[in-house]
Amino acid sequence: MKDGTGLREFQKEFPKRFFDVGIAEQHAITMSAGMAKEGMIPVIPIYSSFYQRAYDQVIHDVAMQNLPVIMCVDRAGCVGADGETHQGTLDMAFFRLVPNLTIMAPKDFKELEDMLEFAVKLNKPVIIRYPRGGEDSKVKFERHENIELGKAEVLKKFIDEEKSNKTKILQKIGDKVFNNKTQRERVTIIAIGKMVARAMDIGQRLQEKMDVEVINARFLKPLDDNTIIESIKKTKNVITIEDGTIINGLATAVKEVIVNNNLQGVKIKSYAYPDEFIKHGSVDELEKIYGLDEENIINGVNKS
């Protein structure tokens, strides 16, 4: 699978560090566990849907032994032309169940590089999931914070936090005069992986009507509870966006944070793939069908 996973050039440059075990995902995981046991740090790129075949080996040979194996989940999320059997919408859900696994998803190529470097140094089993294809061409992230275990990245702060003291005083006066009618709505948008770029687009479009905070979760496990709680306490209004199933992914994790910390009066709306097998179609077509496109999410926020 060196072509499908984009490793042909690596194989040419480092032939002695490259092993193609064929279509044998179970063997690939167990072999990697053995290599890790002997002091190496193996990196394994396998398609999301193919990890299902090696789930037993991930649990018993890697996670239970707490070995430093870096499992790269290629074709995560909707895969488009690869077809229904290759849709990668289940991996966050089934990996989140497994003890000892750290689960990450980068927002762009640079963050993927940073996560790989972080994973090599972590000395624990790691999942890094990423989609088929390239980056979102409309959004370019100029700032990249260092990767810290279980730490999210706040990409967009509230507009009113950037205002001068004079502006804030004038707004408070206006609030009193107009019976708080000048108070803007607030929303926290939490996204992971490729959907972070979409969250930023949505945040930019919504900022004329409301104050928006966009959080790049980075880690599904461990989730950055503190950053999420801090934001939710300010907004009481949460949107989650992910390219995985609605069950046991980011939406579930954020709802657990809200319930476990007894956060009252919080509205939450989640955008993810439904609890069904995703049909064949292009990524754009399927995102529109399942309500993950930008226009549908913006309309949903405006109606909430």
Predicted regions and their residues:
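Thiamine diphosphate
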Residues: 1-124, 134, ...
